[in-house]
Amino acid sequence: MAGTYSSTLKTLEDLTLDSGYGAGDSCRSLSLSSSKSNSQALNSSAPQHRGAAWWCYSGSMNSRHNSWDTVNTVLPEDPEVADLFSRCPRLPELEEFPWTEGDVARVLRKSVGGRRLPSFSAEAVRRLAGLLRRALIRVAREAQRLSVLHAKCTRFEVQSAVRLVHSWALAESCALAAVKALSLYSMSAGDGLRRGKSARCGLTFSVGRFFRWMVDTRISVRIHEYAAISLTACMENLVEEIRARVLASQSPDGGGAGGGEVSAEALEMVINNDAELWGVLQPYEHLICGKNANGVLSLPAYFSPYNGGSLGHDERADAYAQLELRTLEQSLLATCVGSISELSDLVSRAMHHMQGRHPLCPGTSPARQARQPPQPITWSPDALHTLYYFLRCPQMESMENPNLDPPRMTLNNERPFMLLPPLMEWMRVAITYAEHRRSLTVDSGDIRQAARLLLPGLDCEPRQLKPECCFSSFRRLDARAATERFNQDLGFRMLNCGRTDLISQPSSPGPDGVNTMDDQGLTPLMYACATGDEAMVQMLIDAGANLDIQVPSNSPRHPSVHPDSRHWTSLTFAVLHGHISVVQLLLDAGAHVEGSAVNSGEDSYAETPLQLASAAGNYELVSLLLSRGADPLLSMLEANGMASSLHEDMNCFSHSAAHGHRNVLRKLLTQPQQAKADVLSLEEILAEGVEESDTSSQGSSEGPVRLSRTRTKALQEAMYYSAEHGYVDITMELRALGVPWKLHIWIESLRTSFSQSRYSVVQGLLRDFSSIKEEEYNEELVTEGLQLMFDILKTSKNDSVLQQLATIFTHCYGTSPIPSIPEIRKTLPARLDPHFLNNKEMSDVTFLVEGKLFYAHKVLLVTASNRFKTLMTNKSEQDGDNSKTIEISDIKYHIFQMLMQYLYYGGTESMEIPTADILQLLSAANLFQLDALQRHCEILCSQTLSVESAVNTYKYAKIHNAPELALFCEGFFLKHMKALLEQMPSGSSSMAEAAKSRAWTHCRICRAP
């Protein structure tokens, strides 16, 4: 027993590497890590893992090679460890996710730099699609918790969630991908509603499905579209990162150009050996960071400044500094410490090292970062004490303090090593939480949130909106400023405690009284509105609080302002958290119902309270705000009545439609249209007369009320979001009001209805296709719309749906005639007088067809086609020169006679081919490789093609390799499909396959200049 205890203690001692704070072999570790020769020797003996180029073993690992052997070989094979993980809580298994295996396969097939990459097997794609679910759930859970603060999920919550879950390198890569997608989306404002979100962002995954998934999983009651774009881009980028690492392991040069198919086993081997991927893709609720499947700890590759280069002999000062950094690198892999002083020293040195290596924030220009360099983050004493609570090791405490004897018996079970994250991951997660709060200080709350994420079985409530949660460091302030800040904090705490009698006390929050703002840019009234403290709100109103004061932009005076909360008012906070009584109290006191939107310019846009209530689906709040004069179209108009140029703005109709709140949308539609003059663009002025004539011709069937131009534009945007997110009922309801279709909206609605097998809706959509203007037709109709409609044609059994599809195909084909089949002008190499046709005189070969003899001449046949030449040669070799009769089967005598007539006449000019024999002659011409005769038969078939014979002719053309005739039949199907379906509905499947293969070749929009 003593030996086991000694071995365990020795392993813990080596793993913690307390850098001289009492561990017996710390000096040995220090000397080993600074010796290049020793490190190289240990590197050569260490096992090499495939894919290890994506993360590196630091020198600290080399100095403890024996301890790592213990971790690698003993712990994973220990049944107790397997049993330990089996008891850990697991991530939920959800049924629906916003991608399919086909989507993942398309991302994996995307070329990089024009290079053709190896393909992934179907099993590898299926496995990767399943593993991605775990990464998505982790990011979504963290975004859900971060969104509690303001009851809204924006791109900032998603980006912080990605940084919490992924390593620094992966998170930075995902952030860059999100910035790229958002930039492309913003630059495609001119496309408006003509293209889908994914196409505008340059993404393969569906942004609309991700948005719908975020709504269905209730990440927040409000989802910003930029949040969905960011999450989509991050997940797609993760697939590309995994692909790059797998291909790098497959290729000898690491370039990913190796041949062969990537198997599921190769995929899993790379993931298991990658410390940045393995933990994220595990099924357990707690996040395993900095370890691979073997339990090997590692730091991020870019954290270490060493690339294997040698140091100069005369650079002693630099060598000493690098030695200190290498020792720090070892220490950051510690999973437990022996004293609070040791922990404080490690954290302090690590933060000092990280400040010099802080990467440029994605989306921030280098010039701006140079003008406003990031402030260093400090750790509060309570944060260090809380972190020490989770990293404390009783055995090491005894070694740190010789006067402290280890306990004879322990009351608590120690966490096994496999469940302990390294110190580096504790710091990474805690710093990310602090940065999300825009705080310069890591507090104990950040450590508790990190413990919940990193350790199994722990939980704590999300951060709440409180004044004390964003204190800046008082160390940077002089005595006077620090005293004022302490008094301000005391005033906020007094007002936040809920006692209304403290408002009149001398300790006011600041020089502005009850309108003083804290680091987050919030006033006491905003905090009271967020918490729903009606009594405190009333007292602050009576004390003269400004109801319409706005949250300022980020500044040194207010360093912790959340970017999305700028220009919010007290009414905004009350609406965000759904406190109806507080909203009514503020409105009764004179708060502006539109918040800050009326007095804000384009550069200070903020969502109105009605928009926030519409997104949340709060029917009572929407009704209250509408009754007080809130304008649902305010985001579509500026103060001068001009349409907003901020294309990312969503009006109230769009917010309710995007989140699927049908009852709220109906309530918004009951609001009477305000009599505001429409300001038209030049394009709208030129098109106004045409639109009015179209409207008058349609009559009143479009809807009961004539919509104004502004409301029509707003409702059309709402249709776009409802179609993108799969809310077909809302889309159809808006269409019933007379909102005109956009082609993309129609295609998305048709796709959703078809996938849900709602054929009644499909029928209505197909019937409404004729209302789409032809100038709306674009490439999407060819690549997506026709493909979808042909899929419906193949699977639908509804006669009405088939007839409507036929009408659409005929309409798309247009009135132009089917392109004719060109003749082949070919002169036969040899000719004989027609007198010798089937003439026994001078004949040197005889054919036996249907028991009848047919006399011919070799000189003509051998030069006519290779088929005849082969036939003659094989016959001579088999039977010798004595037998001159060649039997021809499967061809009728008169068909063979017409075939020979073509050869002896030298063409088709003098031939008369009966209509009933054309197909048989075509088959014979194809058999004997007479191309000109076959083409002539194809032309004759096209001239006699009818509704009754079209399907059979098409099948005959496919069997006998007549491509021009098959192409002509496909055009005939498109042009006469309605009549074809009426004549023979059983042939619809064949026609669907035929027309689908060449539909876009014939479609009118493709032939347009």
From Swiss-Prot:
ANK repeats lie at residues 520-549, 566-595, 605-634, 648-677. One of its GO terms (molecular function) is protein heterodimerization activity. One of its GO terms (biological process) is cellular response to toxic substance. Pfam families: Ank (PF00023), Ank_2 (PF12796), BTB (PF00651). Highly expressed in liver, brain and testis with lower expression in the spleen. Keywords: ANK repeat, Repeat. Residues 843-912 form the BTB domain. May be involved in the initiation of hepatocyte growth. This is Ankyrin repeat and BTB/POZ domain-containing protein 2. It comes from Rattus norvegicus (Rat).
